[in-house]
Amino acid sequence: CVTTFFTGILPIILFAIETFLPNPGDYSFIRHGVAGNLTSKWWMTNENITENGMYGQKGILFNEAIWGAFKGTLIVAVCCALLAGTIGLLVGYCVSKNRRSKWAAYVNNMAFLPYLMPSLAVGVAFFVFGSSMGIFNTYLLLVLAGTVKYIPFASRSALSSMMQLSGEIEEAAIIQDIPWHKRMLNIIIPIQKSSIISGYLLPFITCVRDLTLFMLLC
């Protein structure tokens, strides 16, 4: 518990307090015991002013650049999560159903390959690709790069969940002549929904906090 507090909770608390300090790193209010030294200017300033260390920027809640970046990040993260999660789910399903096939092993290894590549290398590769295809500095290129990079997270999660599922359940549905899409939507996904949801959340969370992959593409 002590380790968790000092490595996970305390940094977040200090980071939150930092946003209310009049000057970065000025913790004099603790020494003097005067909370009035704190300020909300970094949050609530709604005009472009240069004094008080604002450098011509509005506060966080009124800063169009920050909200625009936040919106763009969510768009890219959601699209990457949906695409990578769906592709990973299909890869995991196919590999689990053909686990003795050499092609299944090949597909499984190829799906895991982007995880072994540094994010900067993937970013450079898509930088060259996007420049040659005329899609540089577009959402399309960001989503393509993110999807390829984060497929391993989704495919491993899906494969793990599919390997835990008994084959007899789907075999019973096949005997009753239930189509594949209904077997997936009504049987497989509901049973393994927690693992499948994590296969979508992992790409989303990783995409939100990843800078190295996208810094060359924007």
Predicted features along the sequence, with ranges:
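Membrane-proximal transmembrane or re-entrant/amphipathic helices at the cytosolic face
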Residues: G33, T39-W42
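Glycine/proline-centered hinge or cleavage motifs at structural transition points of membrane proteins
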Residues: Q176-I178, P190
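Short alpha-helical segment that forms part of, or immediately flanks, the ligand-binding pocket
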Residues: E170-E171
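Membrane-water interface segments at the C-terminal ends of transmembrane alpha-helices
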Residues: V2-P24, W42-M54, G59-M163, I187-L211, ...
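Solvent-exposed soluble domains appended to multi-pass membrane proteins
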Residues: R183-M184
